[in-house]
Amino acid sequence: MAGSVDKPSYELFSKDTRAFVYGMQTKAVQGMLDFDYMCGRTVPSVAAIIYTFGSQSISKLYWGTKEILLPVYRTIEEACTKHPEVDVVVNFASSRSAYASTMELMEFPQIRCIAIIAEGVPERRAREILVTSKEKNVVIIGPATVGGIKPGCFKIGNTGGMMDNIVASKLYRPGSVAYVSKSGGMSNELNNIISHTTDGVYEGIAIGGDRYPGTTFIDHLIRFEADPACKLMVLLGEVGGVEEYRVIEAVKNGTIKKPIVAWAIGTCSSMFKTEVQFGHAGSFANSELETAVAKNQAMREAGIYVPETFEKLPALLQEVYEGLVKKGVIVPQPEVAPPNIPLDYAWAKELGLVRKPSSFICTISNDRGSELTYNNVPISKVFEEELGIGGVISLLWLRRRLPSYATKFLEMVLQLTADHGPCVSGAMNTIITTRAGKDLISSLVAGLLTIGTRFGGALDGAAQEFSKAYDAGLSPRAFVDSCRKANKLIPGIGHRIKSRNNPDLRVELVKGYVKKNFPSTKLLDYALAVENVTTSKKDNLILNVDGCIAVCFVDLLRNCGAFTLEEANEYINLGILNGMFVLGRSIGLIGHHLDQKRLRAPLYRHPWDDFLYLS
Protein backbone atom coordinates (compact mmCIF):
# COMPACT_ATOMS: atom_id res chain seq x y z
CA MET A 1 0.00 0.00 0.00
CA ALA A 2 1.12 3.58 -0.60
CA GLY A 3 2.81 5.45 2.14
CA SER A 4 3.49 9.06 2.89
CA VAL A 5 5.96 11.04 4.91
CA ASP A 6 3.10 12.68 6.78
CA LYS A 7 0.62 9.82 7.04
CA PRO A 8 0.88 6.24 8.32
CA SER A 9 0.67 3.64 5.57
CA TYR A 10 -2.78 2.49 6.64
CA GLU A 11 -4.30 5.97 6.40
CA LEU A 12 -5.57 7.07 3.00
CA PHE A 13 -7.75 9.94 4.20
CA SER A 14 -7.80 12.33 7.13
CA LYS A 15 -9.31 15.66 8.11
CA ASP A 16 -6.45 17.32 6.25
CA THR A 17 -6.82 15.37 2.99
CA ARG A 18 -6.79 17.58 -0.10
CA ALA A 19 -7.89 16.32 -3.49
CA PHE A 20 -8.23 17.17 -7.15
CA VAL A 21 -11.40 16.33 -9.04
CA TYR A 22 -10.57 15.35 -12.62
CA GLY A 23 -13.48 16.36 -14.84
CA MET A 24 -16.05 19.14 -14.63
CA GLN A 25 -18.27 17.42 -12.07
CA THR A 26 -19.43 20.42 -10.05
CA LYS A 27 -22.38 18.57 -8.52
CA ALA A 28 -20.08 15.92 -7.09
CA VAL A 29 -17.63 18.58 -5.94
CA GLN A 30 -20.45 20.45 -4.20
CA GLY A 31 -21.44 17.24 -2.45
CA MET A 32 -17.87 16.79 -1.23
CA LEU A 33 -17.75 20.38 0.04
CA ASP A 34 -21.10 20.01 1.80
CA PHE A 35 -19.79 16.88 3.49
CA ASP A 36 -16.63 18.74 4.53
CA TYR A 37 -18.72 21.53 5.99
CA MET A 38 -20.90 19.09 7.91
CA CYS A 39 -17.81 17.40 9.33
CA GLY A 40 -16.47 20.69 10.66
CA ARG A 41 -13.50 20.90 8.33
CA THR A 42 -11.95 24.35 8.15
CA VAL A 43 -10.51 23.88 4.65
CA PRO A 44 -12.40 22.30 1.71
CA SER A 45 -11.11 18.88 0.72
CA VAL A 46 -11.21 19.78 -2.98
CA ALA A 47 -8.27 22.02 -3.84
CA ALA A 48 -9.00 22.36 -7.55
CA ILE A 49 -10.73 20.92 -10.60
CA ILE A 50 -8.76 19.61 -13.57
CA TYR A 51 -10.65 20.06 -16.84
CA THR A 52 -8.55 19.56 -19.93
CA PHE A 53 -11.17 20.71 -22.44
CA GLY A 54 -11.71 24.24 -21.17
CA SER A 55 -9.53 27.19 -20.36
CA GLN A 56 -8.03 27.99 -17.00
CA SER A 57 -10.81 29.53 -14.98
CA ILE A 58 -12.60 29.36 -11.66
CA SER A 59 -15.69 27.53 -10.47
CA LYS A 60 -18.11 29.06 -7.98
CA LEU A 61 -19.29 26.66 -5.28
CA TYR A 62 -20.81 26.81 -1.83
CA TRP A 63 -19.03 26.47 1.48
CA GLY A 64 -21.94 26.36 3.86
CA THR A 65 -24.03 29.40 2.97
CA LYS A 66 -21.14 31.30 1.39
CA GLU A 67 -19.70 31.07 -2.09
CA ILE A 68 -16.07 30.18 -2.68
CA LEU A 69 -13.93 29.99 -5.80
CA LEU A 70 -12.13 26.83 -6.84
CA PRO A 71 -9.45 27.06 -9.53
CA VAL A 72 -9.94 25.06 -12.72
CA TYR A 73 -6.74 23.95 -14.45
CA ARG A 74 -6.21 22.58 -17.93
CA THR A 75 -3.26 20.37 -17.08
CA ILE A 76 -2.35 17.99 -14.28
CA GLU A 77 1.14 19.44 -14.14
CA GLU A 78 -0.12 22.94 -13.45
CA ALA A 79 -2.54 21.71 -10.78
CA CYS A 80 0.18 19.71 -9.01
CA THR A 81 2.61 22.61 -9.17
CA LYS A 82 0.12 25.02 -7.66
CA HIS A 83 -1.13 22.57 -4.99
CA PRO A 84 1.72 20.38 -3.72
CA GLU A 85 -0.32 19.37 -0.66
CA VAL A 86 -2.82 17.37 -2.76
CA ASP A 87 -2.33 13.59 -2.68
CA VAL A 88 -5.76 12.26 -3.73
CA VAL A 89 -7.53 12.46 -7.09
CA VAL A 90 -11.17 11.66 -7.82
CA ASN A 91 -11.05 10.76 -11.51
CA PHE A 92 -14.36 11.29 -13.31
CA ALA A 93 -12.83 10.80 -16.76
CA SER A 94 -14.91 8.70 -19.14
CA SER A 95 -14.11 5.05 -19.83
CA ARG A 96 -12.34 6.18 -23.01
CA SER A 97 -9.94 8.54 -21.26
CA ALA A 98 -9.75 7.08 -17.73
CA TYR A 99 -6.67 5.02 -18.63
CA ALA A 100 -4.65 7.88 -20.10
CA SER A 101 -5.56 10.34 -17.36
CA THR A 102 -4.81 7.85 -14.59
CA MET A 103 -1.45 6.91 -16.08
CA GLU A 104 -0.55 10.60 -16.34
CA LEU A 105 -1.65 11.24 -12.76
CA MET A 106 0.62 8.47 -11.52
CA GLU A 107 3.61 10.27 -13.02
CA PHE A 108 3.38 12.83 -10.21
CA PRO A 109 4.93 11.51 -6.98
CA GLN A 110 2.68 13.59 -4.73
CA ILE A 111 -0.40 11.58 -5.81
CA ARG A 112 -0.82 8.54 -3.55
CA CYS A 113 -4.48 7.62 -4.12
CA ILE A 114 -6.71 7.75 -7.22
CA ALA A 115 -10.38 6.81 -7.35
CA ILE A 116 -11.48 5.85 -10.88
CA ILE A 117 -15.24 6.29 -11.15
CA ALA A 118 -15.77 5.26 -14.78
CA GLU A 119 -17.35 1.96 -15.73
CA GLY A 120 -16.35 0.09 -18.85
CA VAL A 121 -12.60 0.62 -18.68
CA PRO A 122 -11.10 -2.11 -20.92
CA GLU A 123 -9.76 -4.98 -18.82
CA ARG A 124 -6.34 -4.83 -20.47
CA ARG A 125 -6.07 -1.15 -19.55
CA ALA A 126 -7.25 -1.89 -16.01
CA ARG A 127 -4.48 -4.48 -15.63
CA GLU A 128 -1.90 -1.99 -16.90
CA ILE A 129 -3.13 0.56 -14.36
CA LEU A 130 -2.87 -2.10 -11.65
CA VAL A 131 0.74 -2.96 -12.52
CA THR A 132 1.81 0.67 -12.77
CA SER A 133 0.11 1.58 -9.49
CA LYS A 134 2.14 -1.06 -7.67
CA GLU A 135 5.34 0.22 -9.27
CA LYS A 136 4.49 3.81 -8.34
CA ASN A 137 3.15 2.90 -4.88
CA VAL A 138 -0.24 4.48 -5.64
CA VAL A 139 -3.52 3.20 -4.21
CA ILE A 140 -6.20 2.77 -6.89
CA ILE A 141 -9.87 2.56 -5.91
CA GLY A 142 -11.95 1.34 -8.85
CA PRO A 143 -12.55 1.36 -11.77
CA ALA A 144 -16.36 1.21 -11.74
CA THR A 145 -16.70 2.49 -8.21
CA VAL A 146 -18.68 5.10 -6.36
CA GLY A 147 -15.56 5.59 -4.25
CA GLY A 148 -15.36 5.58 -0.50
CA ILE A 149 -15.95 7.60 2.63
CA LYS A 150 -14.25 8.32 5.91
CA PRO A 151 -16.83 9.91 8.21
CA GLY A 152 -15.74 13.19 9.70
CA CYS A 153 -12.85 13.42 7.23
CA PHE A 154 -13.35 12.92 3.52
CA LYS A 155 -15.66 11.45 0.92
CA ILE A 156 -15.02 10.51 -2.68
CA GLY A 157 -17.37 12.09 -5.20
CA ASN A 158 -20.98 10.99 -4.79
CA THR A 159 -20.33 8.38 -2.09
CA GLY A 160 -23.00 8.36 0.59
CA GLY A 161 -25.71 9.87 -1.57
CA MET A 162 -27.67 13.00 -0.69
CA MET A 163 -27.01 15.00 2.45
CA ASP A 164 -30.14 13.74 4.20
CA ASN A 165 -28.90 10.17 3.70
CA ILE A 166 -25.48 11.10 5.07
CA VAL A 167 -27.12 12.58 8.17
CA ALA A 168 -29.40 9.57 8.60
CA SER A 169 -26.38 7.25 8.41
CA LYS A 170 -24.38 9.47 10.80
CA LEU A 171 -21.51 9.77 8.37
CA TYR A 172 -20.59 13.22 9.64
CA ARG A 173 -18.67 11.68 12.57
CA PRO A 174 -16.48 8.57 12.82
CA GLY A 175 -17.53 5.27 14.35
CA SER A 176 -15.57 2.08 14.97
CA VAL A 177 -16.65 -0.14 12.04
CA ALA A 178 -14.82 -0.19 8.71
CA TYR A 179 -16.23 -1.95 5.68
CA VAL A 180 -15.21 -2.89 2.19
CA SER A 181 -17.55 -3.93 -0.60
CA LYS A 182 -17.59 -4.31 -4.34
CA SER A 183 -20.90 -2.58 -4.93
CA GLY A 184 -21.26 1.16 -4.52
CA GLY A 185 -25.01 0.84 -4.20
CA MET A 186 -24.70 -1.77 -1.47
CA SER A 187 -22.19 0.42 0.35
CA ASN A 188 -25.07 2.81 1.00
CA GLU A 189 -27.02 -0.07 2.51
CA LEU A 190 -24.02 -0.92 4.68
CA ASN A 191 -23.84 2.70 5.85
CA ASN A 192 -27.46 2.43 6.93
CA ILE A 193 -27.06 -0.97 8.63
CA ILE A 194 -23.88 -0.03 10.47
CA SER A 195 -25.32 3.27 11.71
CA HIS A 196 -28.35 1.49 13.23
CA THR A 197 -26.53 -1.46 14.82
CA THR A 198 -23.18 0.00 15.95
CA ASP A 199 -21.59 3.32 16.81
CA GLY A 200 -21.18 4.01 13.08
CA VAL A 201 -18.84 3.79 10.13
CA TYR A 202 -15.15 4.45 10.59
CA GLU A 203 -14.27 4.08 6.91
CA GLY A 204 -15.95 2.50 3.91
CA ILE A 205 -14.51 1.56 0.52
CA ALA A 206 -16.27 0.27 -2.59
CA ILE A 207 -13.51 -1.37 -4.64
CA GLY A 208 -15.62 -1.50 -7.82
CA GLY A 209 -17.34 -4.26 -9.69
CA ASP A 210 -14.90 -4.87 -12.55
CA ARG A 211 -12.79 -8.02 -12.76
CA TYR A 212 -9.51 -6.18 -12.18
CA PRO A 213 -9.92 -3.56 -9.45
CA GLY A 214 -6.89 -1.50 -8.49
CA THR A 215 -7.15 -2.66 -4.89
CA THR A 216 -9.00 -5.63 -3.44
CA PHE A 217 -10.73 -6.65 -0.22
CA ILE A 218 -7.53 -7.84 1.42
CA ASP A 219 -5.67 -4.60 0.66
CA HIS A 220 -8.15 -2.51 2.60
CA LEU A 221 -8.81 -5.03 5.36
CA ILE A 222 -5.07 -5.12 6.10
CA ARG A 223 -5.17 -1.32 6.33
CA PHE A 224 -8.10 -1.52 8.74
CA GLU A 225 -6.28 -4.17 10.77
CA ALA A 226 -3.33 -1.81 11.18
CA ASP A 227 -5.49 1.19 12.07
CA PRO A 228 -5.98 1.34 15.85
CA ALA A 229 -9.16 3.40 15.49
CA CYS A 230 -10.89 0.57 13.59
CA LYS A 231 -12.26 -2.10 15.94
CA LEU A 232 -14.60 -4.14 13.74
CA MET A 233 -14.68 -4.91 10.02
CA VAL A 234 -17.44 -5.74 7.55
CA LEU A 235 -16.84 -7.50 4.23
CA LEU A 236 -19.55 -7.56 1.59
CA GLY A 237 -18.41 -9.82 -1.22
CA GLU A 238 -20.30 -11.38 -4.08
CA VAL A 239 -20.40 -14.29 -6.46
CA GLY A 240 -17.38 -14.49 -8.77
CA GLY A 241 -13.66 -14.15 -8.18
CA VAL A 242 -11.56 -15.55 -5.36
CA GLU A 243 -10.67 -12.42 -3.39
CA GLU A 244 -12.64 -13.58 -0.37
CA TYR A 245 -10.31 -16.58 -0.09
CA ARG A 246 -7.33 -14.25 0.33
CA VAL A 247 -9.15 -12.76 3.31
CA ILE A 248 -9.81 -16.25 4.67
CA GLU A 249 -6.11 -17.08 4.41
CA ALA A 250 -5.18 -13.84 6.20
CA VAL A 251 -7.54 -14.71 9.04
CA LYS A 252 -6.18 -18.24 9.31
CA ASN A 253 -2.53 -17.21 9.40
CA GLY A 254 -3.15 -14.42 11.89
CA THR A 255 -2.49 -11.49 9.57
CA ILE A 256 -5.98 -10.27 10.39
CA LYS A 257 -6.99 -10.60 14.04
CA LYS A 258 -9.84 -8.12 14.34
CA PRO A 259 -13.37 -9.54 14.05
CA ILE A 260 -14.96 -9.55 10.60
CA VAL A 261 -18.65 -9.80 9.79
CA ALA A 262 -19.01 -10.91 6.18
CA TRP A 263 -21.44 -11.98 3.50
CA ALA A 264 -21.10 -12.92 -0.16
CA ILE A 265 -24.07 -11.76 -2.22
CA GLY A 266 -25.51 -14.02 -4.91
CA THR A 267 -26.40 -17.22 -3.06
CA CYS A 268 -29.42 -17.61 -5.32
CA SER A 269 -27.12 -18.18 -8.32
CA SER A 270 -26.90 -21.88 -7.38
CA MET A 271 -30.61 -22.16 -8.17
CA PHE A 272 -29.96 -21.48 -11.86
CA LYS A 273 -28.83 -24.23 -14.22
CA THR A 274 -26.79 -21.87 -16.40
CA GLU A 275 -24.18 -19.23 -15.61
CA VAL A 276 -25.76 -15.99 -14.37
CA GLN A 277 -24.05 -12.60 -14.10
CA PHE A 278 -25.34 -10.30 -11.38
CA GLY A 279 -24.74 -6.79 -12.68
CA HIS A 280 -21.01 -6.32 -12.19
CA ALA A 281 -18.49 -7.41 -14.79
CA GLY A 282 -16.83 -9.71 -12.29
CA SER A 283 -19.97 -11.11 -10.64
CA PHE A 284 -20.24 -14.55 -12.18
CA ALA A 285 -18.79 -17.87 -11.04
CA ASN A 286 -16.35 -19.79 -13.21
CA SER A 287 -16.25 -22.67 -10.75
CA GLU A 288 -17.96 -23.99 -7.64
CA LEU A 289 -15.27 -22.27 -5.60
CA GLU A 290 -16.44 -18.85 -6.83
CA THR A 291 -20.09 -19.28 -5.87
CA ALA A 292 -21.47 -17.18 -3.05
CA VAL A 293 -22.58 -20.28 -1.12
CA ALA A 294 -19.06 -21.74 -1.17
CA LYS A 295 -17.52 -18.45 -0.13
CA ASN A 296 -19.90 -17.95 2.78
CA GLN A 297 -19.25 -21.48 4.02
CA ALA A 298 -15.48 -21.08 3.73
CA MET A 299 -15.54 -17.77 5.58
CA ARG A 300 -17.71 -19.25 8.32
CA GLU A 301 -15.30 -22.16 8.77
CA ALA A 302 -12.36 -19.75 9.03
CA GLY A 303 -13.91 -18.02 12.02
CA ILE A 304 -15.39 -15.04 10.22
CA TYR A 305 -18.86 -14.07 11.41
CA VAL A 306 -21.23 -15.02 8.57
CA PRO A 307 -25.04 -14.88 8.97
CA GLU A 308 -27.39 -17.49 7.57
CA THR A 309 -28.89 -14.90 5.22
CA PHE A 310 -28.19 -11.30 4.34
CA GLU A 311 -31.36 -10.29 6.21
CA LYS A 312 -29.74 -11.55 9.42
CA LEU A 313 -26.52 -9.60 8.90
CA PRO A 314 -27.67 -6.52 10.90
CA ALA A 315 -28.54 -8.63 13.95
CA LEU A 316 -25.24 -10.51 13.79
CA LEU A 317 -23.30 -7.28 13.38
CA GLN A 318 -25.04 -5.78 16.40
CA GLU A 319 -24.30 -8.88 18.44
CA VAL A 320 -20.59 -8.79 17.61
CA TYR A 321 -20.44 -5.05 18.25
CA GLU A 322 -22.12 -5.30 21.64
CA GLY A 323 -19.69 -8.06 22.59
CA LEU A 324 -16.77 -5.74 21.84
CA VAL A 325 -18.40 -3.00 23.90
CA LYS A 326 -18.76 -5.35 26.87
CA LYS A 327 -15.09 -6.30 26.57
CA GLY A 328 -14.12 -2.63 26.53
CA VAL A 329 -12.61 -2.88 23.06
CA ILE A 330 -15.08 -0.28 21.85
CA VAL A 331 -16.01 2.67 24.05
CA PRO A 332 -19.06 4.39 22.51
CA GLN A 333 -18.72 8.15 22.35
CA PRO A 334 -21.53 10.58 23.21
CA GLU A 335 -23.73 11.18 20.21
CA VAL A 336 -23.29 14.58 18.64
CA ALA A 337 -26.21 16.50 17.20
CA PRO A 338 -26.36 16.33 13.41
CA PRO A 339 -25.15 19.58 11.86
CA ASN A 340 -27.43 21.92 10.01
CA ILE A 341 -27.40 21.41 6.26
CA PRO A 342 -27.45 24.64 4.22
CA LEU A 343 -30.49 24.88 2.01
CA ASP A 344 -30.80 26.52 -1.36
CA TYR A 345 -31.95 30.12 -1.48
CA ALA A 346 -35.53 29.49 -2.61
CA TRP A 347 -36.16 26.99 0.20
CA ALA A 348 -34.43 28.89 2.99
CA LYS A 349 -35.32 32.53 2.28
CA GLU A 350 -37.90 32.78 5.05
CA LEU A 351 -35.63 30.94 7.51
CA GLY A 352 -32.61 33.09 6.78
CA LEU A 353 -30.48 30.14 5.63
CA VAL A 354 -29.81 31.33 2.11
CA ARG A 355 -27.62 30.56 -0.83
CA LYS A 356 -27.79 33.49 -3.18
CA PRO A 357 -25.44 33.13 -6.14
CA SER A 358 -23.44 36.24 -6.93
CA SER A 359 -23.59 37.76 -10.40
CA PHE A 360 -20.14 39.31 -10.35
CA ILE A 361 -16.72 38.65 -8.86
CA CYS A 362 -14.40 41.32 -7.43
CA THR A 363 -10.90 40.56 -6.18
CA ILE A 364 -9.41 44.08 -5.92
CA SER A 365 -11.44 46.12 -3.44
CA ASN A 366 -13.97 45.77 -0.64
CA ASP A 367 -16.32 48.41 0.75
CA ARG A 368 -18.33 46.16 3.10
CA GLY A 369 -16.35 46.68 6.29
CA SER A 370 -15.81 49.74 8.42
CA GLU A 371 -13.15 50.95 6.00
CA LEU A 372 -12.67 50.75 2.25
CA THR A 373 -9.80 48.48 1.26
CA TYR A 374 -7.75 48.27 -1.92
CA ASN A 375 -6.62 44.65 -2.29
CA ASN A 376 -7.00 44.21 1.49
CA VAL A 377 -5.02 47.40 2.25
CA PRO A 378 -7.17 49.89 4.25
CA ILE A 379 -7.55 53.28 2.59
CA SER A 380 -6.14 54.94 5.71
CA LYS A 381 -2.94 52.93 5.30
CA VAL A 382 -2.69 54.04 1.66
CA PHE A 383 -2.39 57.62 2.90
CA GLU A 384 -0.36 56.88 6.02
CA GLU A 385 2.31 55.17 3.94
CA GLU A 386 2.02 57.68 1.10
CA LEU A 387 1.57 54.99 -1.53
CA GLY A 388 0.51 57.59 -4.09
CA ILE A 389 -1.30 56.98 -7.36
CA GLY A 390 1.39 54.48 -8.41
CA GLY A 391 0.78 52.46 -5.27
CA VAL A 392 -2.97 52.55 -5.81
CA ILE A 393 -2.50 51.31 -9.39
CA SER A 394 -0.29 48.49 -8.14
CA LEU A 395 -2.98 47.43 -5.64
CA LEU A 396 -5.99 47.71 -7.94
CA TRP A 397 -4.46 46.70 -11.27
CA LEU A 398 -1.65 44.35 -10.27
CA ARG A 399 -3.18 43.13 -6.99
CA ARG A 400 0.00 43.49 -4.96
CA ARG A 401 2.29 46.12 -3.51
CA LEU A 402 5.30 47.02 -5.63
CA PRO A 403 8.60 48.55 -4.49
CA SER A 404 8.79 52.34 -4.50
CA TYR A 405 10.92 52.54 -7.66
CA ALA A 406 8.19 50.59 -9.48
CA THR A 407 5.30 52.78 -8.30
CA LYS A 408 7.31 55.88 -9.23
CA PHE A 409 7.78 54.42 -12.70
CA LEU A 410 4.01 53.95 -13.01
CA GLU A 411 3.51 57.60 -12.10
CA MET A 412 6.22 58.57 -14.56
CA VAL A 413 4.33 56.77 -17.34
CA LEU A 414 1.15 58.68 -16.49
CA GLN A 415 2.99 61.98 -16.58
CA LEU A 416 4.71 61.24 -19.88
CA THR A 417 1.52 60.09 -21.60
CA ALA A 418 -0.76 62.80 -20.16
CA ASP A 419 -0.71 64.91 -23.32
CA HIS A 420 1.02 65.38 -26.64
CA GLY A 421 -0.49 68.63 -27.80
CA PRO A 422 -3.82 69.51 -29.46
CA CYS A 423 -3.02 68.17 -32.93
CA VAL A 424 -3.08 64.43 -32.25
CA SER A 425 -6.30 62.62 -33.13
CA GLY A 426 -7.51 62.03 -29.58
CA ALA A 427 -7.12 65.64 -28.48
CA MET A 428 -8.64 66.90 -31.73
CA ASN A 429 -11.73 64.72 -31.28
CA THR A 430 -12.16 65.94 -27.70
CA ILE A 431 -11.78 69.58 -28.76
CA ILE A 432 -14.30 69.27 -31.62
CA THR A 433 -16.79 67.45 -29.40
CA THR A 434 -16.43 70.07 -26.65
CA ARG A 435 -16.97 72.88 -29.15
CA ALA A 436 -20.15 71.12 -30.24
CA GLY A 437 -21.47 71.81 -26.74
CA LYS A 438 -21.11 68.32 -25.32
CA ASP A 439 -20.36 67.53 -21.68
CA LEU A 440 -17.05 66.39 -20.18
CA ILE A 441 -17.78 62.64 -20.30
CA SER A 442 -18.91 62.76 -23.94
CA SER A 443 -15.89 64.82 -24.94
CA LEU A 444 -13.50 62.57 -23.05
CA VAL A 445 -14.96 59.42 -24.57
CA ALA A 446 -14.80 60.95 -28.06
CA GLY A 447 -11.06 61.33 -27.63
CA LEU A 448 -10.54 57.95 -25.99
CA LEU A 449 -12.33 56.14 -28.81
CA THR A 450 -9.58 57.13 -31.23
CA ILE A 451 -7.03 55.13 -29.25
CA GLY A 452 -6.08 52.00 -31.14
CA THR A 453 -3.32 50.43 -33.17
CA ARG A 454 -2.57 53.71 -35.00
CA PHE A 455 -2.83 56.08 -32.07
CA GLY A 456 -1.68 55.30 -28.56
CA GLY A 457 -2.43 51.61 -28.72
CA ALA A 458 1.03 50.42 -29.64
CA LEU A 459 2.14 49.78 -26.07
CA ASP A 460 0.57 46.34 -25.67
CA GLY A 461 1.64 45.32 -29.15
CA ALA A 462 5.20 46.49 -28.56
CA ALA A 463 5.43 44.64 -25.26
CA GLN A 464 4.10 41.45 -26.79
CA GLU A 465 6.20 41.52 -29.96
CA PHE A 466 9.50 42.41 -28.30
CA SER A 467 8.90 39.87 -25.51
CA LYS A 468 8.05 37.13 -27.98
CA ALA A 469 11.13 37.79 -30.07
CA TYR A 470 13.42 38.00 -27.04
CA ASP A 471 12.00 34.85 -25.44
CA ALA A 472 12.36 33.00 -28.74
CA GLY A 473 16.06 33.89 -28.82
CA LEU A 474 15.85 35.91 -32.05
CA SER A 475 18.72 38.29 -32.65
CA PRO A 476 17.70 41.94 -33.19
CA ARG A 477 18.40 41.66 -36.91
CA ALA A 478 16.49 38.38 -37.18
CA PHE A 479 13.54 40.01 -35.45
CA VAL A 480 13.58 42.97 -37.85
CA ASP A 481 13.95 40.65 -40.86
CA SER A 482 11.05 38.48 -39.72
CA CYS A 483 8.77 41.52 -39.44
CA ARG A 484 9.85 42.74 -42.87
CA LYS A 485 9.14 39.34 -44.43
CA ALA A 486 5.70 39.37 -42.83
CA ASN A 487 5.09 42.93 -44.14
CA LYS A 488 4.45 43.95 -40.55
CA LEU A 489 5.45 47.15 -38.81
CA ILE A 490 7.27 46.77 -35.52
CA PRO A 491 5.08 48.26 -32.77
CA GLY A 492 6.95 50.90 -30.78
CA ILE A 493 9.43 51.67 -33.56
CA GLY A 494 9.24 54.88 -35.61
CA HIS A 495 8.23 58.53 -35.17
CA ARG A 496 6.80 61.14 -37.55
CA ILE A 497 8.95 63.98 -36.21
CA LYS A 498 11.68 62.67 -33.94
CA SER A 499 14.78 60.83 -35.18
CA ARG A 500 18.16 59.58 -34.01
CA ASN A 501 19.58 63.08 -34.47
CA ASN A 502 16.52 64.71 -32.94
CA PRO A 503 15.69 62.33 -30.08
CA ASP A 504 12.47 62.32 -28.10
CA LEU A 505 13.31 63.71 -24.65
CA ARG A 506 10.53 61.58 -23.13
CA VAL A 507 12.33 58.43 -24.25
CA GLU A 508 15.59 59.71 -22.77
CA LEU A 509 13.86 60.37 -19.45
CA VAL A 510 12.44 56.84 -19.33
CA LYS A 511 15.73 55.20 -20.26
CA GLY A 512 17.64 57.23 -17.71
CA TYR A 513 15.29 56.37 -14.86
CA VAL A 514 15.04 52.69 -15.72
CA LYS A 515 18.79 52.22 -16.16
CA LYS A 516 19.36 53.83 -12.79
CA ASN A 517 16.65 52.08 -10.75
CA PHE A 518 15.57 48.77 -12.32
CA PRO A 519 17.35 45.56 -11.25
CA SER A 520 17.43 44.36 -14.86
CA THR A 521 16.80 45.96 -18.27
CA LYS A 522 17.23 42.99 -20.58
CA LEU A 523 14.24 43.76 -22.80
CA LEU A 524 15.09 47.48 -22.99
CA ASP A 525 18.62 46.56 -24.04
CA TYR A 526 17.17 44.23 -26.66
CA ALA A 527 14.84 46.96 -27.97
CA LEU A 528 17.73 49.43 -28.21
CA ALA A 529 19.67 46.84 -30.20
CA VAL A 530 16.68 46.54 -32.53
CA GLU A 531 16.70 50.35 -32.82
CA ASN A 532 20.32 50.21 -33.98
CA VAL A 533 19.22 47.91 -36.80
CA THR A 534 16.17 49.96 -37.84
CA THR A 535 17.86 53.38 -37.71
CA SER A 536 20.63 52.10 -39.95
CA LYS A 537 17.95 51.88 -42.63
CA LYS A 538 16.03 55.08 -41.82
CA ASP A 539 16.87 57.77 -39.28
CA ASN A 540 13.37 58.14 -37.81
CA LEU A 541 12.86 54.42 -37.09
CA ILE A 542 13.70 55.02 -33.45
CA LEU A 543 12.35 53.39 -30.32
CA ASN A 544 9.47 55.77 -29.63
CA VAL A 545 7.97 56.59 -26.26
CA ASP A 546 5.29 53.90 -26.60
CA GLY A 547 7.87 51.23 -27.34
CA CYS A 548 10.24 52.41 -24.63
CA ILE A 549 7.54 52.43 -21.96
CA ALA A 550 6.31 49.02 -23.13
CA VAL A 551 9.63 47.17 -22.92
CA CYS A 552 10.52 48.86 -19.62
CA PHE A 553 7.16 47.82 -18.21
CA VAL A 554 7.91 44.20 -19.15
CA ASP A 555 11.33 44.49 -17.47
CA LEU A 556 9.57 45.79 -14.37
CA LEU A 557 7.04 42.95 -14.20
CA ARG A 558 9.60 40.25 -14.87
CA ASN A 559 12.34 41.45 -12.54
CA CYS A 560 10.77 43.25 -9.58
CA GLY A 561 10.28 39.95 -7.72
CA ALA A 562 6.51 40.26 -7.36
CA PHE A 563 5.46 38.19 -10.38
CA THR A 564 6.21 34.87 -11.99
CA LEU A 565 7.00 34.91 -15.70
CA GLU A 566 3.54 33.47 -16.34
CA GLU A 567 1.86 36.23 -14.33
CA ALA A 568 3.92 38.94 -16.01
CA ASN A 569 2.94 37.69 -19.46
CA GLU A 570 -0.69 37.42 -18.42
CA TYR A 571 -0.85 41.06 -17.32
CA ILE A 572 0.69 42.18 -20.60
CA ASN A 573 -1.88 40.13 -22.52
CA LEU A 574 -4.69 41.58 -20.41
CA GLY A 575 -3.98 45.03 -21.90
CA ILE A 576 -2.55 46.76 -18.84
CA LEU A 577 -0.16 48.91 -20.89
CA ASN A 578 -2.91 50.35 -23.04
CA GLY A 579 -4.71 50.93 -19.76
CA MET A 580 -1.78 53.04 -18.57
CA PHE A 581 -1.94 55.09 -21.78
CA VAL A 582 -5.70 55.54 -21.49
CA LEU A 583 -5.41 56.63 -17.86
CA GLY A 584 -2.55 59.02 -18.54
CA ARG A 585 -4.01 60.51 -21.72
CA SER A 586 -7.37 61.06 -20.00
CA ILE A 587 -5.62 63.77 -17.97
CA GLY A 588 -4.75 65.68 -21.12
CA LEU A 589 -8.09 65.10 -22.82
CA ILE A 590 -9.93 66.48 -19.80
CA GLY A 591 -7.52 69.41 -19.88
CA HIS A 592 -8.39 70.14 -23.52
CA HIS A 593 -12.11 69.93 -22.74
CA LEU A 594 -11.78 72.39 -19.84
CA ASP A 595 -9.55 74.63 -21.95
CA GLN A 596 -12.13 74.89 -24.74
CA LYS A 597 -14.95 75.47 -22.26
CA ARG A 598 -12.98 78.22 -20.53
CA LEU A 599 -12.25 79.87 -23.90
CA ARG A 600 -15.93 79.55 -24.84
CA ALA A 601 -14.79 78.24 -28.23
CA PRO A 602 -17.61 78.21 -30.82
CA LEU A 603 -18.82 75.26 -32.87
CA TYR A 604 -16.06 74.13 -35.17
CA ARG A 605 -16.56 73.77 -38.92
CA HIS A 606 -13.71 72.50 -41.05
CA PRO A 607 -12.76 74.71 -44.05
CA TRP A 608 -13.72 73.56 -47.54
CA ASP A 609 -10.24 74.08 -48.97
CA ASP A 610 -8.88 71.30 -46.75
CA PHE A 611 -10.93 68.68 -48.60
CA LEU A 612 -10.48 67.25 -52.07
CA TYR A 613 -13.96 67.09 -53.56
CA LEU A 614 -14.36 64.47 -56.30
CA SER A 615 -17.95 65.22 -57.24
Curated annotation (Swiss-Prot):
Catalytic activity of the protein: oxaloacetate + acetyl-CoA + ADP + phosphate = citrate + ATP + CoA
Keyword Lipid metabolism in record: yes
Quaternary structure and interacting proteins, as annotated: Composed of two subunits.
Phosphoserine: residues bearing it: 359
Family: Belongs to the succinate/malate CoA ligase alpha subunit family.
UniProt-annotated location(s): Cytoplasm
This protein's name: Probable ATP-citrate synthase subunit 1
Gene Ontology biological process terms from the UniProt entry: acetyl-CoA biosynthetic process; citrate metabolic process; fatty acid biosynthetic process
List of catalytic residues: 280 (tele-phosphohistidine intermediate)
GO annotations of cellular component type: cytosol; nucleus
Keyword ATP-binding annotated: yes
Binding of Mg(2+), residues: 238
